[in-house]
Regions:
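Non-catalytic carbohydrate-binding regions of carbohydrate-active enzymes
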Residues: 263, 267-361, 387-403
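Low-complexity, Ser/Thr/Pro/Gly-enriched N-terminal "stalk/linker" regions
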Residues: 23-78, 84, 88, 108-113
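Beta-sandwich/jelly-roll carbohydrate-recognition scaffolds of carbohydrate-active enzymes
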Residues: 84, 91-93, 420-421
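Aromatic-lined, polymer-binding surfaces characteristic
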Residues: 75, 86-89, 103-255, 261-269, ...
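Bacterial Sec-dependent N-terminal signal peptides
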Residues: 1-25
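Long, charge-dense tracts
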Residues: 98-99
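CBM-like carbohydrate-recognition segments
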Residues: 47-70, 123, 331-422
């Protein structure tokens, strides 16, 4: 009888251990969570477009206040914005892991989709030559090539490359609005410059000079002459300003460009670092972000600047890999964990967290929403990079609200540089 008691006791002690062990085996890593969401977002777009079927099969949603522009802008917005966020991940080499197989499939689809996008004979030839909106999403396509030049631009056949250069060049017909749109012209021309095609240096330098004039301090730029408190510093301004500067200054090797006084590549990164600190502090202990400003339906696109800093190994000393990854993961899980942000055909649905078409702006369609992919830039880091392998840590607001010690915040001014650039 005594022996039976010991056996029962041993079984009781072993059950929780086995349960915990099984749970650990089934729990997904942060990277696996990111990969699964990115694949779910990208696969319906690229699997269809690679076959010339995106226009046929995409379940399109337009804002209730749609302004009447050609709804075919939807497909270019969808493809361009998706690729700007997806490009770094597709730059990694092939391997036989589940992630590697996902990535290889997406890259194969993407290369076919790039070709269809500029092939007039393809049903998925995009709306290049009508709406001014085309400039915006051509810039995101150009950005995808800048971010993954060797993996996504170089493999394209010569005819496809010539078609892109022709379409990008033709966009000089668009007079960009006096706002972040200047960066769309600068990004397209910067790509042409990198690709060795004729580029308009004035469109680059004048745009960057104006963005520099609109810097208001402490990591914030004004989106045009009047400041607006929204996420456009992350959606567009910091990333595209840095990436255009990177091309024209050769990553800071040319410190002074004659007609661009004040435009400094390294200083632009330092400002982005300050803005990244602000973004990290905006993430609540529960993994939510403040809902303010226009285009809030772009969801996790609001984190692009933080994602860019992580991907390029530019995180400031205030932010560790573990805390940034943990904070971004909890936001991604909260936003995409239950599938509510996808419609019945698998495409993103109008809303912030679920189907909420009433909050979309007059220019918004569900292709616009693929800005959400821009948070996933760190997937361009290998799985063994410290961003992915460092232990998870509590992020700033989580520490603060749980009564832990946390760092004080300080405004950033050029004369008080405290953070380094690798």
């Amino acid at each position: 009888m005594k022996r039976l008691h010991w056996i029962l006791l041993l079984m009781i002690l072993l059950i929780p251990t086995e349960s915990i062990s099984a749970k650990k085996k089934t729990e997904k890593s942060d990277r696996e969570i990111w990969c699964d969401v990115m694949y779910r977002m990208a696969a319906p777009v690229l699997s269809n477009m690679s076959e010339g079927l995106l226009k046929q099969n995409m379940l399109v949603e337009l804002s209730p206040t749609w302004d009447g522009r050609d709804k075919n802008v939807t497909y270019m917005e969808c493809f361009g914005r998706l690729m700007a966020g997806l490009a770094p991940w597709l730059s990694l080499p092939d391997d036989e892991t589940p992630e590697g197989l996902q990535r290889k499939q997406l890259r194969e689809w993407a290369l076919k989709s790039y070709a269809n996008a500029v092939d007039p004979a393809s049903p998925d030839y995009l709306l290049w030559r009508q709406e001014n909106q085309t400039l915006v999403d051509a810039a995101f396509l150009a950005e995808s090539f800048l971010r993954s030049y060797d993996a996504l631009w170089m493999p394209l056949d010569s005819i496809t490359k010539q078609r892109y250069i022709a379409e990008f060049t033709d966009l000089r017909r668009v007079d960009p609005s006096y706002s972040n749109w200047l960066l769309f012209s600068a990004t397209v021309e910067s790509f042409l410059r990198k690709a060795g095609a004729p580029s308009d240096t004035y469109r680059i330098s004048s745009s960057l000079r104006k963005i520099e004039e609109w810097y208001v301090g402490d990591g914030w730029y004004s989106d045009g002459p009047r400041f607006a408190f929204d996420y456009y510093n992350s959606f567009v301004i910091h990333p595209m300003y840095i990436e255009a500067l990177e091309v024209i200054t050769e990553a800071g090797k040319r410190e002074k460009i004659g007609n661009m006084p004040g435009c400094n590549y390294h200083e632009a990164i330092r400002r982005a670092q300050r803005f990244g600190v602000i973004l990290e502090r905006l993430i609540s202990p529960e993994g939510t972000l403040p809902v303010f400003g226009r285009s809030i339906t772009y969801r996790t696109g609001s984190l692009q600047t933080l994602a860019l800093l992580a991907w390029r190994n530019w995180l400031p000393e205030e932010l560790s890999n573990g805390q940034v990854r943990a904070a971004m993961t909890v936001v991604i899980q909260r936003m995409f964990g239950d599938g509510r942000n996808f419609n019945t055909a698998g495409f993103l649905t109008l809303g912030f967290n679920g189907s909420q078409p009433g909050i979309s702006d007059y220019y918004t369609n569900n292709g616009s929403l693929y800005m959400a992919s821009l948070a996933f830039l760190p997937l361009g880091l290998s799985a063994d990079d410290p961003f992915w392998t460092d232990a998870s840590q509590s992020w700033t607001s989580k520490k603060a609200w749980e009564g832990e010690e946390f760092p004080k915040d300080h405004s950033y001014h050029k004369e008080s540089v405290r953070i380094s650039i690798l």
